[in-house]
Amino acid sequence: MKKIQTITSAANPVIRFTHALVHTRGRAAKEGLFAVEGVRLAEMAVSSDWNIHHVLVTEQGMNSTRARTLFTQLCAADVPIYSVSDSIFRTISETDAPQGILIVMERKIRDDDTLHEHTYTFGAVAPLYIALDRIQDPGNVSTILRTADAVGISGVIL
């Protein structure tokens, strides 16, 4: 079980890497990673079968019961967790009102055949995908996913 490490400098390599991942176009794809923000998306990330690279959290981000449950699970899974100040977190966050938790996750690498699993025959309905890029409000992702599911979208590409 790993402890939560405190980072106090914006020049720390983890902070610089995460900032570049979130704010430099193409960096996340190049690294095979992506970031999600907010308690709800963090809960979804922890309950998924996707690998978590590392977590940034503020003191405020650890205050809720839901967040403490998340951190217990993350610590048990030996995920690196870094505590940062609100000011450092705001430089990385893309939301107007950050909740104080950001998870960097590994992308699942899929080859072209994966998307073609939904091949169709003449007369059948073609598969339909939604691609999401640089979502401003992480709460919008869950809304988009629920809507996509309701209308029968074949998949969502993050």
Provide a role label for each language-model segment.
Residues 17-20, 91, 131-134:
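Residue-level recognition of specific faces of alpha-helices
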Residues 61-63, 87-91, 98, 108-111:
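A short acidic, glycine/proline-enriched capping/turn motif at secondary-structure boundaries
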Residues 36-37, 58, 104-106, 133:
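Short beta-strand segments
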Residues 47, 73, 82, 87, ...:
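RNA substrate-binding interface of SAM-dependent RNA methyltransferases
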Residues 50, 96-98, 125-127:
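Short connector loops at helix/strand junctions that flank enzyme active sites
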Residues 71-101:
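Glycine/small-residue-rich loop that forms an oxyanion/phosphate-binding "nest" at active or ligand-binding sites
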Residues 1-72:
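Boundary-proximal intrinsically disordered activation/regulatory segments immediately upstream
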